[in-house]
Amino acid sequence: MGDEKLSRHTSLKRARSLSESIKGLFKPSGISGSNNAAAPSSRPGQDQAHSHQTARIITSNVSSPSISPVHSPVLQAAPKHHKLGVPNIAKLSLSPSREPSLNSENEMFSQESFISEKDEDEANLLEREDLQNKKEEKARAKHVRSKEAYVPHHRYTVGSDEVERQPRERLKNFPQNAGSSNPANSNANHVLDQENNFSIDAMLDYDEESKLRRRNSLGVRNHSNRTRSRKNSLSTPRSPPMKNGNGGMNSNATNNVGNGTGNRIYMRGRNHSDSISASSLPKFQEIECKCILDLGHFKVFENGYHEHSLRVLPIITNNKNVDSGDEKDADASVNSGDDGDNDSEANMHKQKSVFSLSGLFKSHKDGNQQQQQQQQQEENGEQINLEKAFSIIPSQRFIKSQTLKKSRTSNLKNGNNDELMKNDGKNIPQIVNPNAAVGVEELKLINALSEKIRKGLKSENTKGNNGEGRSNSNKQEDSDDTEGKAGTTNDDTSHKPCSQKYGKSIGVVGAGAYGVVKICARCKTAKDVLPYSTYSNGKKLFFAVKELKPKPGDQIDKFCTRLTSEFIIGHSLSHPHFEANAMIAGNVSRTTPPKHVFNAPNILKILDLMEYSNSFVEVMEFCASGDLYSLLTRNNISNESNNGSSRLIQTVKEGSGSPLHPLEADCFMKQLLNGVQYMHDHGIAHCDLKPENILFQPNGLLKICDFGTSSVFQTAWEKHVHFQSGAMGSEPYVAPEEFIRDAEYDPRLVDCWSCGIVYCTMVMGQYLWKIAIPEKDSLFKSFLSEIKDDGQFYLFEELRHVSSELNRLRKIALYRTFQVDPTKRITIEQLLQSSWMRKTKCCVVYRHLHTKVSK
């Protein structure tokens, strides 16, 4: 038995291959059969019917199923059970030099077995046959399962006629010397006997565990290890490779069991780094593209993309102390001249001239008038003291959109709708348009601000009340109102003065009828996280502060309406919370997060509204590259190289404007249309689009500002769009239907006309006409006659683009935009979907930005 075990271990590989080759010899139908030869396809049930003729298998103590097939005891089988003659084994030609003799130590078909069977008692024979039949049925069932589950990798093709079961008589007539145990025959056939014993044992007595172990031999185990490695590489974190004894690198691997010959070691996963950067992928690899056009502020590359590099205002770049982080030094450097004397008037006027924010004010003044106004305010002491200006926005609705959205959504989810549905004792109408910018929250804020503004303006005329007392009174009222409401918290920054929240003034960038626009700067703090709500140079944050004060003789109600409407519209667009209206309307589940709560990239952020005495301060996002008007007037690009137009309109503004490159103008046009479309989707039309109301960041991001004359054509409780009448805005950009007396028009189509004028201004350097009235403007009259007679306008025909196809598509869009009949005019949405805009490459990627309102 010791030699038997040793031979089994040493011939494991060969026994594996041989056992697979003769697997067909031990099919279920071959375990029991009749005396006559049965066909290979005989059903197991047919053999079971003749089980009384089945040979017996004489065994010793049978091993338990838990023992491995390699170490299970050898089974001795009667020749009439296997019906396997030596001539059939010889037909396999596994070893042609070997004789068909069996091993003397492990002979399974020995002559002594036949002799012992003849001398046994008949009763014992029947008892053994019954016992053996039960074992054969169990073995047959196991063999069927193993045959269905196991498919060998290598199979020898053996004809069915060569593996026929032999008759019992043939085995009985086997020669007596067939079991000779001479050393030569024993050594030659020892491996064959080991393979036969191993295969019989594995086929009859192995359980599910041993079957899996048998299946995981060398070839199958390697395959399973590779499969397991792929799964592990995806589900478990990879450990870094370790150095082996030879200095090489070894990754985590699964060793092959029983493989002591140095087989391949498969790693747990692919050999790559622990983390992969998106920039390393082919799609995101930064490939240096050749620049084919460089205009300083605008570059175009050979792959079709472009880059904006707009200049930052000198008030930021020329002020050395702005980057120093010292607010006192920065403030002093602006308010003192070169000789150290206080020369704030001249310095502010000089800085103001490089940036135009005249669009924020309806009264356009030249530089001398603005200087005189600034000087008069300083002499009269009418400058707003930012250190004493406090916010009049209720704390629970204040500034940060994240905090604002969180508190409102929390109140709605908790079912606290009673407070939202109250408006001075009156119920708010039912919400039918939840996407409208003016809804429940805005209505409440309008009422609260209007009351505070009127109260502040009237208290100025009351004797015994000064500005400081009024500001402190407002501060105390806001604090008491905040603390008195359940579920609200008093923010540390909500009641700080303007100078602490937004920094000190570093200069003036604009002036108008109601005051001036200053720039305030403060150092960044740990609470300032990306993305910033305004421009930052890395060390400081900059804010635009617009001072508003009613002129003598102005009606309080008129000033209050303008101030509140401008702030409310801008604040609601830049800090949208349309989920509140949607939840109240029942269109959004209280447990479902809002889907359309985000800031529009092309809308200027309105941050705060503050008060000091009878003056007010509106805090806005600061755009460091100025407005479109300043960009057009300081460019030095030839007209012929950009649009090819030989006939230019006479410049009617100060200075000579220079047009933009068509690709740059197309990018700005697409941003402008997206911003206007965002306003239209939320029920607001701008009604005063012009270069002065279009601001830029240094990277070319466009911002729409000045919502003082905007029209709310649909609120949250209005089902249909309502029109308006009367001309609004600046004359060169006003649509012709606005000049028709007592005629109503769609404010959205007015914005589309204005966008067309703005684009022509960008590519031509000036606007088309002074006013869209044929009796007052000869050029507009010429436009009407040419369109009526020829169907085209010579200025549009002479425009040139980088390609003839883009030029053709642009002309089609322009003709549809400048339809005098508003019913035939293209809409902003249709213009965005035109072939011209779809082929325009834009710097801003717009995703899920627009949500339509009800019509």
From Swiss-Prot:
Protein kinase domain location, by residue?
Answer: 503-837
Biased-composition ranges, Polar residues, are 31-45, 94-114, 462-474
Query: Compositional bias of type Basic and acidic residues: which residue ranges?
Result: 125-139
**EC number(s) per entry:** 2.7.11.1
What is catalysed by this protein?
L-seryl-[protein] + ATP = O-phospho-L-seryl-[protein] + ADP + H(+); L-threonyl-[protein] + ATP = O-phospho-L-threonyl-[protein] + ADP + H(+)
Return the annotated region ranges for Disordered: 1-167, 214-260, 319-347, 401-429, 457-500
Name of the top EC class for this enzyme: transferase
Name the residues that span the membrane: none
PROSITE patterns with a match to the protein in the record:
PROTEIN_KINASE_DOM (PS50011), PROTEIN_KINASE_ST (PS00108)
Modification Phosphoserine occurs at = 17, 19, 68, 72, 160, 273, 277, 324, 333, 336, 358, 391, 395
Looking up SMART domains in the UniProt record yields: S_TKc
The record ties this protein, via Pfam families, to: Pkinase
Which stretches are annotated as coiled coil? none
Highest taxon of the source?
Eukaryota
Q: Which residues of the sequence carry a binding annotation for ATP?
A: 509-517, 546
Stretches with biased composition (Low complexity): 57-74, 249-258
* Active-site residue numbers: 688 (proton acceptor)
Q: Does Repressor show up as a keyword for this record?
A: no
An example molecular function term from Gene Ontology annotations: protein serine/threonine kinase activity
Hey, which family's this protein in? Belongs to the protein kinase superfamily. CAMK Ser/Thr protein kinase family. NPR/HAL subfamily. HAL5 sub-subfamily.
Q: What does this protein do?
A: Protein kinase involved in salt tolerance and pH sensitivity, probably by regulating plasma membrane potential and cation influx. Positively controls the TRK1-TRK2 potassium transport system in response to potassium starvation. Stabilizes TRK1 in the plasma membrane by preventing its vacuolar sorting and degradation. Also stabilizes other plasma membrane nutrient transporters like CAN1, FUR4 and HXT1. May itself be subject to regulation by ARL1.
Q: State the protein's name.
A: Serine/threonine-protein kinase HAL5
Task: Give the originating organism.
Answer: Saccharomyces cerevisiae (strain ATCC 204508 / S288c)
**Gene encoding it?**
HAL5
